[in-house]
Amino acid sequence: MQFTPPFEQGVLLRRYKRFLTDIRLSDGSEVTIHCPNTGSMKNCLFPGEKVWFSTSDNPKRKYSRTWEQAESDVGHIIGINTGRANQLAEDAIKAGVITELSGYHSLKREVKYGSENSRIDILLSDDTGSTDTSFSGTPPTNTEPANTKAKPNCYVEVKSCTLLEEGQGYFPDAVTTRGQKHLRELMEMVESGHRGVLLFVVQHTGIDSVQAAAHIDPDYASLLTKAHSAGVEVIAYSAEMSPKGASLLKSCPVKL
């Protein structure tokens, strides 16, 4: 994923009211920008350190600038915009980086599914007759032999992981009833004969492994263990990030 134009740099002053952040620009002026992260952002807020932001030319926006990345007090880069995680995942699937999700013909985003009225982040299917053009004509990275049974549909729920504590990456950074619902929906898909995959997109260059934050949301941690035992696949991939672009490059261990 390339950022055009590249993100601009500022200095973090404060985050408040969840969606607002004050920064200092290179000319010394102070401005308020949009914070596209609904989580607690625990251990992601470092006043006085560098931040990077994008700028929209949409005149209807109250805040034209959006906080995208931050630098920690020890120099790690953190992806603040959780909305980037789904695109990073899609790009990596198309490029064949996420080997666990290769070989499908169709990729669709935000498809309704489940008994709790959710929308799956990514739906992969082996439907060669699909009108979906998400792969832009690119064949899957590993094709099935002719006349073999089609792959089961693969429901992929994407979560952005940015919480680093004592060298360990954790998800979530706050209690998430929505995340618990998504785990139940994935279990339901597995029970119906499909694949259910929880994909952690690690947007923190200091995180080397991921595990459920039982000390923050014990219900989520317990449900994740149950989901994994029920057949939900849990994987993580780490992002390389800069003001010019970002991409998922390598698998990251998940401690279950």
From Swiss-Prot:
Instruction: Note down the stretches annotated as region Disordered.
Output: 128-149
> Which InterPro entries does this entry report, sorted A to Z?
SfsA, SfsA_C, SfsA_N
Quote the Pfam families the UniProt record gives: SfsA, SfsA_N
Q: Which CDD domains match?
A: SfsA-like_bacterial
**Gene3D superfamilies on file:** 2.40.50.580, 3.40.1350.60
One GO MF annotation is: DNA binding
Q: Which domain of life is it from?
A: Bacteria
Start-end of Low complexity biased regions:
128-141
PANTHER family membership: SUGAR FERMENTATION STIMULATION PROTEIN A
* Annotated family: Belongs to the SfsA family.
Q: What is this protein called?
A: Sugar fermentation stimulation protein homolog
Q: Which organism is it from?
A: Shewanella sediminis (strain HAW-EB3)
